[in-house]
């Protein structure tokens, strides 16, 4: 309607979160590419928690905290992962990465083989965790007065 306000900001953030979660969970439903639904749900939860830290800081008067793995970062990684998976499905491009060892398995959250969808989910999970921790530490510092407000 050409106007902005608190409701518009609220609606924008709500739709962003629904889309973020929807994309990651939809990837998890595609069992053809070996991404487990429970892994996708975990990645969606971590993504949501990272976003929550930014809005929670705003709710206690700090202003919106941005930083970490942003929505734009997640979207770029997800779109690139989808393109890569499409090329793999069409037989145009082959990516076969077999993960060995406990640490390697930990880094890719238990996926046995990586592909475009797996990359998107793993990056979303680790990015969500990184964002959650980064924003929490930033908000904590501002609330306790040890870090100037950015």
Show which residues each predicted segment covers.
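Hydrophobic alpha-helical transmembrane segments
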Residues: 19, 23-150
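Juxtamembrane helix-capping/reentrant segments at transmembrane boundaries
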Residues: 2-16, 65-69, 150
């Amino acid at each position: 309607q050409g106007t902005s306000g608190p409701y518009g900001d609220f609606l924008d953030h709500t739709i962003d979160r629904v889309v973020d979660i929807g994309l990651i969970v939809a990837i998890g439903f595609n069992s053809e590419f070996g991404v487990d639904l429970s892994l996708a749900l975990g990645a969606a939860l971590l993504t949501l928690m990272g976003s929550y830290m930014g809005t929670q800081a705003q709710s206690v008067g700090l202003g919106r905290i941005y930083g970490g793995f942003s929505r734009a970062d997640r979207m770029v990684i997800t779109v690139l992962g989808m393109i890569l998976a499409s090329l793999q499905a069409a037989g145009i491009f082959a990516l076969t990465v077999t993960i060995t060892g406990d640490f390697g398995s930990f880094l890719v959250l238990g996926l046995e083989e990586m592909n475009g969808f797996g990359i998107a989910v793993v990056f979303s999970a680790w990015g969500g965790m990184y964002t959650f921790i980064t924003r929490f530490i930033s908000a904590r510092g501002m609330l306790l007065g040890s870090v100037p407000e950015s």
